[in-house]
């Protein structure tokens, strides 16, 4: 698609310009897509201005001194409450008056497109359109009460005399009064009439009608400041804030329309997350529940610290709890619960999931020892070694050590990655990764460096920082809120995020060393804990500012430099950005200060400030939804190995500074894995892993190719580029970091047309199929014998007398019995494939046939249908006799039965007189033999039967489970002619079901269809498919034979039976040979079968393809993404799909952008906006 594709198609543009004015005004629909009477617009205007009219009445009474200001507020609020209830009652009346089933308003596209037939100004349809009503009765009452309170407080907030006192300017008072009431009317309309669709949308569905409270909540926040200023008159800063906020109050409609102010649910989560991180010293969490629990516990810890009366007790309390709260307590409790379930006999035994932290007794022991050392160090240093800060004090000496540690850790970290600062090639990093063994050997030196870094980071640095804090004299200022907040946070951050805490403490130490003997506010007004808090906030916002500036510059430049991103408007947009650079920069700074995404509208250089939201960016539970498909299984298999590999990568520092909100992209062959860091603590990290689609679209392919180029330049072509080569893809949002070994499946596809089309291979295929099928049948019977040997043999069968020679000839097997009967049977099967053995007279009820039952064969001189053998079941003798009588009555024979009164001779299949007593353990089930097979085909199979191969198979089996000498058992079984005849019958039943009665040389197309299980229909095939177990064995043998044909063509012919056995045993043990669409294929992947093979056909090229998956350790490439670029594109996606509803399949924002990786970023978003095919639950990765 060209670069001039419309951002919104014609239909969506019209839709947008109807929706946006509604958003600005808070809900009134003054622009419709169809003709409407004027009173529709007049009614909405009246409802919109009702709060102003009622508030104006109270304002007049207050200004003329009839009522006091607070009575004025009560008066206006009461009127508004009555009006709100009247409006809602009108809606209820209209809904009851109509007989049609009413569907209440949903915030979706269809609601905006519904058409109404209006009859009158106050008709039912008019009322229902103008006043849609609430979903819940509780909301009807609650929203009306809120509307009344809002109108009353709004009247008080905008009283002219009060405004004149604030500003002392009549013109300013008039402006604020007019536009202030416009803001209140916009907020009231969503409460009493109809809420607007907000550009700031967090949840896709507004189930509980929270959106209606969004605008009133912000109005209440402004009014709260004014009320505080009214009752607290001694705070000049509060009065100044009130004056400023009255002016900002006028611009609330624009802030709502631009989506800068967050929805209430996002605001609460964002507020808790920011407070937990910067005030309480914690980390963003992987779920809303964890955020809430940790927020409450951390806040309780900080409050409790305020009441501790002793400084040593304070140090012990905040130092100990700071360490404990930084541990992964939730995951430890989950693992402990699993262990208790496994050990307790009264609880259901369940083993821990493979993705859970495999916790042993060592970790709690180490943590307990560390806790004791922390308490001992902190208390002793605070009690015995504290002193005022000076250049030579103990705290200053510790600060020097901290500086050395920070520099050392930074150097050791940069040595681990592919690039230094993401720009210069790291000379210590291995330049070529194509040979796994060589790469791992050469990386061993860096692994030793990583161990040293890990020790410094997890043990040395935290204890050094504990010493620094414990020596601070500010801890003696008991019952101080700043000390409790600052030092509780500081002791917690040491363990929660050691690298950031070390950097912040070094900055504070350097500043302290420079200004310790001066009287600047840094020294006088702030204690060490608050200094650390401020530095942490500044550090975080500066890092975000740099990332956002990089993202903005990339969007600006690529809108011109990338040919496919260049639009007709690109020049104008770039010019506007240059001219209004201060405003653009202020937008970037504002988004950094608010920690909100910088939204590039449609990924164009049109920058807006998105609303603040949690680090996870999405409201739903992590990993709760994904677009699952057959390819999902490959990500499920590789995730445990990838988590283990990430453990060492995170701990070594090769992935750079890992903080909550960091994004990484992993690449291996056609797989793209998206990593999001959710939380970070002491020796653990919580991540979410997403798998992107494997069926590559054109846009996906373009970006995946660029990803491959970036990784190849970093890991495969670095040697030719030079030791200190520059990163030529520095502007890309992805920076290559490292490679990690992961045990996963490599995917290889080969063209098999030359093999499957070979006439020699096709002729040999039938003989190989007989051998493979024979091996499969014998092994199946052998396994059954091992599983059933432990069971006692049926007593009746044990005590049964040996049959006579006559019985053996007539009853041992119906097919191998009387030759005359076989010839007669053969005559009726000359046109075998066109007959059915169903009950054509429908005398007996039809049942599902699960096997061949024992039959009654009528012998002697009797009349019957010529050439047929009459049979009947003996399961129910009475029913069968009636059935036989009915049969003769239908046919209409007139001769009397000469054998009437004689006992019917019954013969059972299990009375085969095997020559060996062990043959019964390996016999074929009788329902695996097609009794109607012509004798001619049996004779044909006897000629093709590989007797040497048959005997060789028995020599390879272990018969110790039969409690005899294996050699004796093997010899007896191989010489048992009855057993051999039975296997010949089984082979014939399957072979001719596959290849047909003609037994022609198969074609390549037939071979492909048969591999898929789509053989041409025949009676024998119908019989075979009616026995699922046998059919699966036959299909397995067929596929093994096909794989054998491929291996013989590529590796050479099979020299002897031993080699053939080795091939088949390898197929059986290490391979899954089938179809990639089979459920068994997915199970084999999850069970980690070493090899998988499938056959396919490319209709475009007209060739047959073979696909082989090989499980082995491979190197997965990992790159770090610009987190702000990802958040910005996700924010734009949310705006575009949830507000503009731009569901066009070819919309501009999912087109390929090789620099910003726009298509891949959209895929990685949570459904319904994105479409990852796999998304894991939060995975806890230990970092030790």
From Swiss-Prot:
Cellular component, GO, one term: membrane
Glycosylation sites: 523, 848, 915, 1132, 1159
Disordered: region residues: 788-820
Pfam families assigned: Pecanex_C
Signal peptide: none
Assigned keywords, A-Z: Glycoprotein, Membrane, Transmembrane, Transmembrane helix
Principal location class: membrane
Domain of life: Eukaryota
Membrane-crossing segments per the record: 40-60, 73-93, 141-161, 166-186, 218-238, 244-264, 305-325, 366-386, 391-411, 455-475, 502-522, 573-593
Subcellular location: Membrane
Membrane-related topology note: Multi-pass membrane protein
Family: Belongs to the pecanex family.
Protein name: Pecanex-like protein 4
Source species: Xenopus laevis
Protein encoded by which gene: pcnx4
């Amino acid at each position: 698609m060209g670069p001039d594709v419309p951002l919104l198609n014609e239909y969506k543009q019209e839709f947008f310009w109807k929706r946006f004015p509604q958003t600005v005004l808070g809900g009134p629909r003054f622009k419709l897509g169809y003709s409407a009477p004027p009173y529709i617009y007049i009614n909405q205007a009246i409802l919109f201005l009702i709060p102003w009219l009622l508030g104006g009445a109270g304002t007049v009474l207050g200004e003329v001194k009839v009522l006091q200001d607070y009575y004025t507020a009560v008066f206006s609020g009461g009127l508004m409450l009555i009006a709100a209830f009247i409006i809602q009652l009108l809606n209820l009346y209209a809904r009851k008056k109509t007989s049609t089933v009413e569907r209440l308003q949903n915030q979706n596209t269809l609601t905006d497109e519904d058409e109404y037939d209006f009859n009158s100004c106050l008709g039912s349809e008019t009322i229902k359109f103008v006043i849609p009503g609430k979903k819940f009765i509780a909301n009807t009452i609650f929203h009306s009460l809120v509307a009344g309170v809002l109108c009353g407080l709004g009247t008080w907030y905008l009283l002219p005399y009060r405004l004149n006192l604030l500003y002392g300017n009549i013109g300013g008072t008039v402006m604020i009064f007019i536009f202030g009431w416009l803001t209140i009317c916009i907020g009231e309309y969503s409460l009493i009439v109809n809420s607007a669709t907000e550009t700031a949308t967090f949840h896709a569905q507004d189930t509980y009608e929270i959106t209606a409270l969004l605008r009133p909540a912000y109005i209440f926040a402004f009014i709260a400041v004014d009320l505080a200023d009214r009752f607290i008159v001694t705070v000049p800063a509060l009065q100044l804030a009130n004056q400023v906020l009255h002016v900002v109050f006028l611009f609330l409609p624009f802030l709502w329309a631009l989506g800068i102010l967050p929805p209430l649910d996002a605001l609460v989560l964002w507020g808790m997350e920011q407070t937990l991180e910067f005030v309480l010293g914690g980390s963003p969490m992987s779920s809303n529940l964890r955020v809430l629990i940790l927020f409450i516990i951390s806040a309780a810890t900080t409050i409790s610290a305020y009441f501790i009366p002793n400084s040593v007790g304070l140090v012990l309390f905040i130092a100990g709890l700071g360490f404990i709260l930084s541990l992964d307590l939730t995951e430890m409790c989950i693992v402990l619960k699993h262990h208790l379930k496994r050990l307790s006999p009264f609880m259901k035994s369940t083993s821990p999931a493979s993705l859970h932290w495999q916790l042993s007794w060592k970790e709690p022991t180490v943590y307990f020892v560390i806790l004791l050392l922390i308490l001992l160090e902190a208390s002793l240093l605070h009690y015995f070694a504290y002193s005022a800060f000076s250049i030579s004090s103990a705290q200053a000496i510790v600060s020097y050590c901290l500086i050395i540690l920070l520099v050392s850790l930074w150097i050791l970290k940069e040595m681990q990655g592919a690039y230094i600062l993401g720009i210069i090639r790291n000379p210590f990093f291995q330049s070529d990764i194509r040979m796994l063994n060589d790469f791992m050997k050469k990386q061993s030196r860096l692994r030793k460096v990583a161990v040293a870094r890990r020790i410094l980071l997890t043990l040395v640095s935290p204890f050094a920082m504990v010493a620094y804090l414990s020596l601070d004299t500010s801890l003696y200022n008991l019952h101080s809120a700043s000390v409790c907040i600052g030092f509780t946070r500081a002791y917690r951050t040491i363990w929660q995020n050691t690298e950031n805490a070390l950097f912040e403490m070094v900055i504070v130490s350097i500043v302290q060393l420079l200004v310790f003997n001066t009287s600047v506010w840094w020294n006088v007004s702030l204690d060490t804990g608050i200094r650390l808090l401020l530095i942490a906030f500044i550090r975080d916002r500066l890092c975000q500012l740099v990332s956002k500036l990089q993202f903005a510059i990339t969007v600006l430049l690529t809108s011109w430099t990338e040919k496919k991103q260049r639009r007709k408007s690109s020049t104008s947009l770039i010019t506007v950005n240059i001219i209004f650079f201060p405003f653009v920069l202020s937008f970037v700074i504002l988004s950094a200060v608010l920690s909100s995404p910088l939204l590039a509208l449609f990924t164009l250089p049109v920058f807006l400030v998105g609303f603040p939201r949690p680090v996870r960016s999405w409201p739903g539970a992590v990993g709760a939804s994904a677009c699952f498909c057959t390819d999902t299984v490959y990500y499920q298999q590789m995730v445990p190995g990838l988590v283990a590999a990430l453990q060492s990568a995170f701990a070594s520092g090769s992935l750079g500074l890992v903080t909550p909100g960091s994004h990484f992209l992993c690449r291996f062959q056609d797989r793209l894995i998206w990593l999001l860091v959710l939380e970070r603590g002491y020796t653990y990290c919580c991540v979410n892993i997403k798998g992107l689609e494997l069926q590559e679209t054109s846009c996906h392919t373009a970006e995946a190719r660029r990803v491959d180029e970036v990784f190849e330049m970093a890991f495969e072509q670095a040697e030719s580029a030079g030791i200190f080569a520059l990163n030529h893809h520095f502007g890309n949002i992805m920076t290559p970091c490292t490679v990690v070994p992961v045990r996963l499946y490599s995917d290889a596809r080969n063209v098999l047309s030359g093999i499957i089309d070979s006439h020699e291979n096709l002729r040999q295929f039938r003989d190989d199929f007989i051998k493979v099928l024979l091996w499969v049948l014998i092994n199946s019977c052998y396994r059954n014998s091992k599983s059933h040997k432990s069971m006692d043999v049926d007593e009746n069968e044990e005590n049964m007398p040996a049959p006579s020679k006559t019985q053996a000839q007539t009853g041992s097997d119906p097919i191998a019995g009387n030759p005359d009967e076989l010839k007669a049977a053969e005559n009726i099967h000359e046109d075998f494939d066109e007959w059915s053995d169903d009950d054509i007279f429908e005398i007996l009820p039809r049942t599902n046939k699960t096997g061949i039952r024992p039959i009654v064969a009528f012998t002697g001189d009797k009349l019957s249908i010529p050439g047929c053998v009459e049979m009947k079941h003996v399961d129910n003798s009475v029913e069968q006799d009636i059935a036989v009588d009915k049969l003769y009555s239908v046919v209409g024979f007139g001769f009397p039965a000469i054998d009437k009164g004689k006992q019917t001779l019954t013969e059972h299949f299990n009375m085969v007189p095997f020559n060996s007593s062990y043959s019964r353990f390996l016999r074929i089930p009788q329902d695996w033999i097609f009794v109607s097979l012509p004798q001619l085909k049996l004779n044909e199979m006897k000629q093709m039967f590989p007797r040497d191969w048959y005997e060789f198979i028995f020599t390879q089996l272990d018969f110790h489970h039969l409690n005899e000498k294996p050699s004796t058992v093997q010899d007896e079984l191989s010489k048992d002619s009855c057993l051999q005849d039975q296997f010949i019958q089984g082979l014939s039943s399957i072979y001719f079901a596959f290849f047909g009665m003609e037994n022609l040389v198969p074609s390549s197309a037939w071979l492909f269809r048969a591999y898929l299980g789509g053989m041409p229909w025949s009676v024998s095939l119908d019989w075979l498919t009616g026995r699922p177990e046998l059919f699966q064995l036959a299909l397995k043998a067929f596929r093994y034979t096909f794989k054998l044909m491929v291996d013989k063509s590529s590796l050479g012919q099979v020299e002897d039976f031993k080699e053939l056995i080795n091939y088949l045993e390898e197929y059986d043990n290490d391979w899954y040979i089938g179809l990639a669409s089979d459920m068994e294929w997915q199970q084999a992947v999850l069970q980690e079968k070493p090899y998988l093979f499938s056959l396919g056909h490319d209709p475009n090229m007209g060739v047959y393809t073979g696909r082989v998956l090989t499980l082995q350790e491979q190197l997965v490439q990992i790159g770090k993404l610009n987190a702000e670029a990802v958040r910005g594109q996700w924010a734009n996606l949310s705006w575009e799909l949830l507000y503009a509803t731009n569901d066009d399949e070819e919309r501009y924002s999912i087109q390929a952008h090789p620099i910003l990786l726009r298509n891949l970023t959209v895929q990685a978003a949570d459904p319904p906006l994105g479409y990852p095919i796999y998304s894991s639950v939060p995975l806890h990765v230990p970092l030790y």
